Amino acid sequence: MKNYNVCFRVDASSFIGMGHLMRCLSLADYLKQNGYKCHFLVRNFNTKILNVVKRSRHSLHLLPKKKMVSININKSKFIYSDWLQVTQQVDFMESYKFIKKINPGLVVVDHYGIDKTWHLLAKQRGLKLFVLDDLGDRQHYCDILLDTTPGRKKDDYLGKINREAILLLGNNYCIIRDEFLKLRKLSLRRDRTRLSKLMVSMGGMDADNNTLKIMEKLKTLDLDIKITFIMGNETKDYKKIIALSKQLN
């Protein structure tokens, strides 16, 4: 009998951003359309991030919240394992308490702080693993790995993953939300002879406040175009950006 439960281990925050969560939600939405029930295991959450998952109508399970430590994302040797806030062993065991009850047919992991250490603990318990990555910088042990980075090659993962793993590499495997797919034909028909519109997006969190920096720079330029900024409500200086945007258009 086919197992239609899928678990996602993913986080989002001001320093992690929203990208990992959003691509997992896109995949979960597709799976839901095909009869699967998706469960999200999330740590270091805030209310706004929780609401994103709740609105998607997927099942949400909260891992024990840890005290957030200060992370300097500009330091020369940034360690992504800091993102977990706990060791991989602790993270897995706390996740496994939910996984064991759910009994999923597949566990999806999208987290820069998780590598082969976590994966092996899962495989030892007979779990099927689907890993999402776009760094190619660490060891993995899984059944399937998806990396949609343009130009990504198998050689990039040579010696970094178990030989029997299925590799889905390159932008042909991009996870794209339905609303963007529906607009593709319209986009291809657009008149591209002149620049009339500009869209700027620095992600759902924009921890470095680049949206405001770009906006202030564009204000100094004499551009006869419509400029659209896309941002999440967790973006820094949200109200200041809204006020400045009215001066640009």
Predicted regions and their residues:
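Nucleotide-activated donor-dependent transferases that construct or modify glycoconjugates
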Residues: 3-17
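Short amphipathic alpha-helix
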Residues: 21-31
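A conserved mid-protein helix/loop that constitutes part of the nucleotide-sugar donor-binding site
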Residues: 22, 205-218
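Conserved nucleotide-sugar phosphate-binding/catalytic loop shared by glycosyltransferases and other
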Residues: 34-92
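Short N-terminal targeting/anchoring amphipathic segment
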Residues: 85, 96-113
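A nucleotide-sugar donor-handling region in carbohydrate enzymes
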Residues: 141-209, 232-234, 238-239
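A conserved nucleotide-sugar
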Residues: 216-233, 237-240
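Nucleotide-activated donor-binding/catalytic signature segment of Leloir-type glycosyltransferases, i.e.
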Residues: 239-249
